[in-house]
Swiss-Prot record:
Binding note for cofactor: Binds 1 Ca(2+) ion.
InterPro entries, per the entry: PLipase_A2, PLipase_A2_Asp_AS, PLipase_A2_dom, PLipase_A2_dom_sf, PLipase_A2_His_AS
GO biological processes: arachidonate secretion; lipid catabolic process; negative regulation of T cell proliferation; phospholipid metabolic process
Active-site residues per Swiss-Prot or TrEMBL entry: H63, D105
Cofactor: Ca(2+)
Location (main, coarse): secreted
Protein name stated in the entry: Acidic phospholipase A2 4
Length: 139
């Protein structure tokens, strides 16, 4: 059920921030975000609970924390401007909310790229029923 919800959100949100975030992830990891990270581990995808399963999942945990800090900006749907330049992601918005959301996505994409070697297929489409351990850290 979680996977269907995530796919539905991705399809509805292709014009919004989730599409932009997906492009950043693809740029940094070489992996298509929707198929590789939309239901990965305990934190990649919609929602999250428990303990991150590996460094890639921890990137998503940190991304969730960042979104919590900018929650008043509607981070999952806020459009922002950015560009790829010499392998870097440059957030280019003067609006504080848009800039903050872009920076959350940028940092997560960089983190996923730096940890792409930890990606483990066993955590792809991981059931949230396995995410019952207490969080290892707080935001």
């Amino acid at each position: 059920m979680r996977t269907l919800w995530i796919v539905a959100v991705w399809l509805v949100g292709v014009e919004g921030n989730l599409y932009q975030f997906g492009k950043m992830i693809k740029n940094k990891t070489g992996k298509p975000a929707m198929f590789s990270y939309s239901a990965y581990g305990c934190y990649c995808g919609w929602g999250g609970q428990g303990k991150p399963q590996d460094p890639s999942d921890r990137c998503c945990f940190l991304h969730d924390c960042c979104y919590t800090r900018v929650n008043n900006c509607s981070p999952k749907m806020t459009l922002y401007s950015y560009r790829f330049e010499n392998g870097d992601i440059i957030c280019g918005d003067n609006d504080p909310c848009r800039k903050a959301v872009c920076e959350c996505d940028r940092e997560a994409a960089i983190c996923l790229g730096e940890n792409v070697n930890t990606y483990d297929e066993k955590y792809r489409f991981y059931s949230s029923s396995y995410c019952t351990e207490e969080e290892s850290e707080k935001c």
